[in-house]
Design a protein with these regions (language model features):
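Sec-dependent signal peptide cleavage junction
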Residues: 15-24
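Sec-dependent signal peptide recognition
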Residues: 2-10
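Residues marking helix boundaries in flexible regions
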Residues: 9, 22, 64, 165-166
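Active-site cradle of extracellular carbohydrate-active enzymes
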Residues: 256, 260
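Long, compositionally biased stretches
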Residues: 23-99, 105-119
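Ser/Thr-glycine-rich phosphate-binding loops at phosphate-binding pockets of nucleotides
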Residues: 261, 265-266
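Cys-dependent protein tyrosine phosphatase-like superfamily
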Residues: 101-255, 269-362
Length: 362
């Protein structure tokens, strides 16, 4: 009995010396700015966030404005449409309260200077989702197989329609490469889905601007600046799409469609144009997913590939067709659906037919 008592006592003494890992204290911070997407950028950095004991894959409880709720912490928008998240930008280290394809400001009423509290809800609660989706790419040309892969540049229809990263905005260090490629392709008309005219002028005045061909096109009136939201479900996006397509219909081929990365906004626009050209669902999906191969090395047959395909391009197709979320897009005529989508949103019949004719195979 004495031996048993001594053993228990020793074990209890051991436990008393084991350090207890304290739950991170809540972070009290403020909204530094509201970005162009209506999301709240905080006045703390990722370094502050990590030092406080929080990490990617955690679930936290956020209080901001009229909003109190639980959010996952991700370095990408790995949540369903209209779901909230704490977005930890892997490139600039900012912390943002966001809504996927929505506005956190509209949800919470929060404004610049307002107080925000972040508290731990569940450590590592969504770490598996973070690890599957962790999409971070290099800005070094040497890490990519070719200039085309680096600039996410490719022909949709050789000699008629191309897509790429921005040749004017050098934030992701690819503008000059893209500019060289569009010059070699002989691009004549550009649909810029992300910038205003004022922003383009500012970008061309920047010290690191080195895209002479884009400047030439812009100064010749061959670039339309649309400043479109990333949310393709809002009216302004579709209005911008129709305006951009009408501009292309009046321009000379080859066309270029781009945003910043040539991924989301460009993805929806190109999807619609491919549908107009009679592409199958399989062809459209394969082209869209090529961007994820270029940037992140994500290939068919992987969990990441299937997840991104389901959450992104297949949802885009369903939206264009106004289908229920559980309806197969392969059951519909995509060309007819794309034409109806554009007509219903204000594209003139003459412009639509002119665009289709310019994209048609010779």
């Amino acid at each position: 009995m004495k031996k048993l008592f001594a053993t228990i006592l020793a074990f209890l003494l051991f436990l008393a010396q084991v350090p207890v890992i304290a739950e991170p204290s809540a972070i009290n911070c403020k909204v530094a700015e509201i970005n162009t997407y209506g999301h709240a950028v905080l006045d703390i950095t990722d370094e502050d966030f990590y030092k406080a004991g929080f990490a990617l894959g955690d679930i936290v409880t956020v209080t901001a404005g009229s909003y109190t709720g639980d959010m996952p912490c991700f370095n990408g928008y790995y949540v369903d449409r209209e779901a909230t998240l704490v977005y930890i930008n892997p490139f600039v280290g900012s912390i943002t309260l966001g809504v996927n394809y929505g506005s956190f400001v509209n949800l919470s009423g929060v404004g610049k200077g307002d107080a925000v509290t972040i508290a731990m809800k569940e450590k590592g609660g969504v770490l598996d989702i973070q690890e599957v989706n962790n999409l971070v790419y290099s800005d070094e040309r040497a890490d990519f197989a070719s200039d085309e892969v680096f600039a996410n540049f490719r022909p949709v229809v050789e000699g008629k329609l191309y897509r790429s990263v921005s040749p004017v905005d050098n934030r992701i260090k690819r503008a000059r490469t893209a500019d060289n490629l569009i010059r070699e392709a002989g691009v004549q008309t550009v649909m810029n889905m992300v910038n205003t005219d004022e922003e383009i002028v500012e970008l061309m005045a920047a010290d690191d601007y080195d895209s002479p061909y884009y400047r030439e096109l812009y100064e010749a009136g061959k670039v339309i600046a649309l400043e479109m939201s990333i949310d393709y479900t809002v009216k302004a996006f579709v209005e911008g799409l129709v305006e951009g397509f009408t501009f292309l219909s009046e321009g000379e081929t080859p066309f270029l469609v781009h945003c910043l990365e040539g991924k989301d906004r460009t993805g929806f626009a190109i999807m619609t144009l491919e549908a107009l050209m009679g592409w199958s669902e399989e062809q459209i999906v394969a082209d869209y997913m090529k961007t994820y191969s270029n940037f992140y090395g994500i290939e068919p047959g992987t969990d990441r590939y299937d997840l991104i395909m389901e959450k992104n391009i297949e949802e885009m197709l369903r939206y264009m067709e106004a289908l229920q979320a559980d309806t197969s897009t392969s059951e519909t005529d995509l060309k007819t659906a794309a034409e109806a989508f554009l007509r219903e949103n204000g594209m003139a019949e003459e412009a639509l037919k002119r665009l289709e004719a310019k994209l048609a195979s010779e």
